[in-house]
Amino acid sequence: MEFIQKKDIPYFSECEPLVEGLGFKLVDLNVLHKKDVWQVKAVIKSEKGVGIKDCTSVHRTLQPRIEALIGSQDVTMEVSSPGINRLVKRAVEFYAFVGEEAQIWDNSITDWRHGIIKEVNSEGLVLNSDNQDIQIPYQDIKKARCNL
């Protein structure tokens, strides 16, 4: 799995403070231009969980900002929670799950590791499994699930 800085994800740095101001973490932001329409998908989480009203609130806050950043009002936007057993698509998502349970396929042992994500950095993460801290570099992570 490759690590991409938050600042390198288009519009993430501009949107993250708005989402955090509403009391949520921005897990992922995906902005695609298809034909004449921009498609935006935002994934948010909160310690209390995420409901439809939360998604609506974030949508109403982010939509005008995204439109201004892109320079277009032809934007469709979807805001959702990570859901249960979130399949991690980008290593940067691990930041949102520090302190939570994860299941990680570790290529170095060709098996799943289970534990609590203790620390995340640009090289890898520390997983606490059976009271033992295990350093797992992103290059050894084939896939991962969080929010178990």
Curated annotation (Swiss-Prot):
Provide the protein name: Ribosome maturation factor RimP
Q: Write down the Gene3D superfamilies for this protein, in alphabetical order.
A: RimP-like superfamily, N-terminal (3.30.300.70)
Q: Name the coiled-coil region(s).
A: none
State any GO BP term from the record.
Answer: translation
The protein's matches in SUPFAM superfamilies, at most eight in alphabetical order, are given as: YhbC-like, C-terminal domain, YhbC-like, N-terminal domain
Species the sequence originates in: Treponema denticola (strain ATCC 35405 / DSM 14222 / CIP 103919 / JCM 8153 / KCTC 15104)
Where does this protein reside within or beyond the cell? Cytoplasm
What are its GO cellular component terms?
cytosol
Keyword Cytoplasm part of the UniProt annotation: yes
Q: What PANTHER family does this protein map onto? A: RIBOSOME MATURATION FACTOR RIMP
This chain is encoded by the gene named rimP
Spell out the family assignment given in the record's similarity comment.
Answer: Belongs to the RimP family.
Biological role stated in the UniProt entry: Required for maturation of 30S ribosomal subunits.
Q: Which UniProt keywords apply?
A: Cytoplasm, Ribosome biogenesis
Specify the domain of life of the species encoding this protein.
Answer: Bacteria
